[in-house]
Amino acid sequence: MQVEKDTVKKIVIVGGGTAGWMAAASISSLIGKDFEITLVESDEIGTVGVGEATIPTFFALHQLLKIDEAEFLSKVQGTIKLGISFENWHKLNESYIHAFGHTGKSCWAAGFHHFWLKGKECGYSDDYGCYSAELSAAKAEKFGFLKQNKLNYAYHLNAGLYAKYLRKLAEKNYVVR
């Protein structure tokens, strides 16, 4: 059965929090007021205001929503992060940091990791993380918004405040709760 594309006029999003309001803000920014968008959420089940982590692909969503980064960080008590730390990763009291971005520089012959492995085998490669600008910056606790040679980063933010922020964006685009 084929459905006429103009037969759907109402969209209902069930569930709030960051996921629900993210969906509402995204959909409403794409289709605007051509559709009636309603978000249904419980007043009894609140958003947990704990820290929420993102990854660099999050920027695509923020570009879609035309979010001003400085305002956003202020409103959601956000901080910048350059990677994800995995505590007790291999052994107790050892950690591994997965840095965002590329490690080393590949060339036409092969990927960087091939050269690094050969160097390690021969005894003259440093730790793999030493070749990551993001990891080096994270360990030095340094970050700056650069125009060129930007570091890859993401955010750590308050989930409750982020849900409220997204709700305001969605409601500006005619989403009704």
Where are these regions (language model features)?
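Glycine-rich FAD pyrophosphate-binding loop
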Residues: 28-50
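A conserved beta-strand/loop element that lines the FAD pocket in flavoprotein oxidoreductases
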Residues: 171-177
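Short beta-strand to alpha-helix junction loop
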Residues: 109, 149-168
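A short, Lys/Arg-enriched amphipathic alpha-helix followed by its capping loop at the start of a domain
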Residues: 23-35, 61, 173
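Dinucleotide-binding Rossmann-like beta1-alpha1 core, especially the glycine-rich loop
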Residues: 50-135
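A short, surface-exposed helix-loop junction/capping segment
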Residues: 37-42, 143-151
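Beta1/beta-strand and adjacent pyrophosphate-binding region of the FAD-binding site
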Residues: 6-19
